[in-house]
Amino acid sequence: MQCEEAHVLVLYTGGTIGMKYIDGVYQPEANYLLHAIRDLSLLNDDDYVSTYYSDAEIRPYCLPPLQHSKKRVVYWMIEYDPLLDSSDMTFDDWIHIGKDIQRAYDQYVGFVILHGTDTLAYTACALSFMLENVRKPIVITGAQIPVCEVRSDGRENLIGALIIAANYDIPEVTVYFNNKLFRGNRTVKIDNRSMDAFESPNMLPIAYMDVDIKVNYDSIFRSPSMAPFVVHDQLCRNVGLLRIFPSMSIENVRASLQAPIEGVVLQTFGAGNMPSHRTDIIDELKKAVDRGCIIINCSQCVRGQVDIHYLTGKVLYDMGIIPGSDMTAEAALTKLSYVLSKDCWELVEKKAMMVKNIRGELTVAKAEPLKDLEIVSQMARFLHLSSSHEMKLLCHAIFPQLLCYAASNGDIEMLKALHENGVDLSVVDYNGRNALHVAASAGHVGAVKYLLTQGVSFHLRDQWDENALVSAVKMKNKILIETLRSAGALLSINSRRLGVELCLCASYGDTETLNSWLAAGADINQQDYNGETALHIAVKSRNKQLVHYLLDRDADPYKIDDFNLTPLRHAKKLNLQDLVIRMKKMKKVQ
């Protein structure tokens, strides 16, 4: 019996991870990695693929069964031509990757990008900004040693990235390396010889791959927008880096600030300081700001952030140079490129966006939780709990129930109060349902909209393989369906089950539920396990009103079922001449 599957798309752009050892050096070779993985048992269960995908036009790969997971991770790989050394990566390559993800976004639960390590952090930062309203995991990884070597971090990195992309609700661009998952726009390469090549200096990893996989769900950045996923494929090329150093020549500074430069990342000493006696440099910076150039002040230090409470840092701030908080140089540069390319924003808006935390790229002061939830302390006293570990387990047990209770009642104020007290709105209950499932099932439009603005996932499937959109369909709530669809939600159930649902509606003559399925994006000609469509059932039931309803919505009278019968043939056999006449006038659906 075929297992439940999680489908992942892998984009192989190049890099050490897929190289071959030739004449004493590692070299990229077209199609080498694709063929090599096919024979690596840790990366591909060939028996499973041969059993269930023998007739597939493009055969996928499949990870061996994972401990504590019922899903099989099935993945397809696209190899770029030519394979790119990461040192050759350009803005156009970032756009290429983004567009590839956009084209395949609805077909996969997550994405993995195989990339060379040298500019991997730049690509991760760029994609984090270009990919707007992301609600699926996009994991970038690479290697210090190729996948096919006996000693290889590439093999473990690829497996870990696939597991994250297939199984975890981490809807942002991340970097996976050496058993740690980092936010993409917080990552820097720190070592070219160690397996610990990457670090996130100002933020703890989102997840650790130890004996157990530990995810810090509170640190995940979730899109606050209700808009659907889109790729912003324009980037401003007129940006640069200006690193301050002692006795720097004014000509060097002037050259870095001249038009057509529109944005500069100024890398200063310590907490954002530069020589206070260098009025010539300050004058050049002021001229650039006055002509509309956006300058971001970032520290040359690996850790820490810009502090405008020092005199020289305050001077820069007062002249209009924007403090970059704890952004990395890679994040600041790619964010500048992204923000400057937004022609719909005025200069003031662009500057405001550079200060704002738009993808989790910088640290902003967080309000402390208003108070500890009284129910937690009361239950802890009742159960005689005292240790922090016991309290944590208690919170994990009751928070999902509190969230689902609030969602089922449409209690937005309670949802807000829970969120303000540090509760992760994306947690799931014992049925694998999140608050969005529950709010949609109860028909609470306001609660659904609030949860969407807090980044709660509508892609998440419960133990019945249903997402929030399916819950809304069952409620027959048109407004809810439109709300979720406009945010990018798609039906989660498989095609055969969808066919059964449509045929069941037809057997009852239930046009209201049919309307809901169609509004949610269902194909009116979807077939059930016998190959029958809703139109087959309607004709066989002699329900002429329903037949006309379905034909008005492009149902195909020529669709052949497993018994080689069409709705038209059924109508002829039942002598329903008026239906036969109408069906013959219709064209066959391609």
From Swiss-Prot:
ANK repeats: 398-427, 431-460, 497-526, 530-559
Span list, region Asparaginase: 44-351
Residue numbers annotated as active site: 16 (o-isoaspartyl threonine intermediate)
EC number per UniProt: 3.5.1.1
Catalytic activity annotation: L-asparagine + H2O = L-aspartate + NH4(+)
CDD domains linked to this entry: L-asparaginase_I
Gene3D superfamilies: 3.40.50.40, Ankyrin repeat-containing domain, L-asparaginase, N-terminal domain
SMART domains: ANK, Asparaginase
Binding site for substrate: 85-87, 117-118
A GO molecular function held by the record: asparaginase activity
Gene Ontology process terms (BP): asparagine metabolic process
UniProtKB keywords: ANK repeat, Hydrolase, Repeat
One Pfam family cited in the UniProt record for this chain: Asparaginase_C
Disulphide bonds in the chain: none
Ranges where the Asparaginase/glutaminase domain occurs: 6-357
PROSITE patterns found in the cross-reference section: ANK_REP_REGION, ANK_REPEAT, ASN_GLN_ASE_1, ASN_GLN_ASE_2, ASN_GLN_ASE_3
Tissue specificity annotation: May be present in the larval cuticle.
EC category: hydrolase
The family this protein is said to belong to: In the N-terminal section; belongs to the asparaginase 1 family.
NCBIfam families registered for this protein in UniProt: asnASE_I
Protein name per Swiss-Prot or TrEMBL: L-asparaginase
The species this protein was found in: Dirofilaria immitis (Canine heartworm)
